């Protein structure tokens, strides 16, 4: 998703849906200023992409996410891994920590994760 559409989805994921346009606008405008018409255009695009469902309540449209944040994250992560790192998890992790100090806790977390993957493969 483009950044502006992702911003709208983050509002929906991080709040209790369904939300109307004014509620979305109130949250999003704490970070950046978007006109109501821009928000409506972004919501229409998200509906066309089947990311949100629109239901009517009187004269008001309510927006509910159809794609969960975890599903989106998994899809995007896999896409980045494939396109930028040739499906190499090692290259991906190396690029994340290149030149940065890694805490013992992070090393342990990675080690535990790899052990879990190894156990699943058995």
Language model feature labels by segment:
Residues 40-44:
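Short, hydrophobic-biased segments on the C-terminal half of alpha helices
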Residues 54:
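Short beta-strand "wing" residues that participate in macromolecule-binding interfaces
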Residues 50:
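Glycine-centered, phosphate/nucleic-acid-interacting loop/turn motifs that mediate DNA/RNA or nucleotide
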Residues 68-93:
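Conserved segment of winged-helix/HTH DNA-binding domains
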Residues 6-11, 23:
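Pre-recognition alpha-helix immediately N-terminal to the DNA-recognition helix
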Residues 1-4, 57-76:
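Short, cationic-aromatic polyanion-contact patches
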Residues 18-28:
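Short acidic, hydrophobic short linear motifs in intrinsically disordered regions
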Residues 94, 98-122:
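C-terminal regulatory/oligomerization modules of transcriptional regulators
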């Amino acid at each position: 998703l483009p950044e502006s559409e992702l911003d709208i989805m983050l509002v929906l994921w991080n709040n209790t849906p369904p939300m109307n346009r004014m509620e979305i606008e109130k949250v999003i405008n704490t970070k950046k200023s978007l006109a109501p018409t821009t928000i409506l255009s972004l919501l229409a695009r998200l509906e066309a992409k089947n990311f949100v469902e629109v239901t009517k309540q009187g004269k008001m449209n309510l927006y509910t996410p159809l794609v969960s944040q975890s599903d989106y994250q998994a899809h995007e992560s896999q896409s980045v891994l494939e396109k930028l790192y040739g499906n190499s998890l090692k290259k991906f992790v190396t690029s994340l920590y290149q030149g940065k100090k890694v805490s013992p806790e992070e090393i342990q977390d990675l080690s535990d994760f790899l052990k879990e993957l190894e156990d699943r493969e058995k």
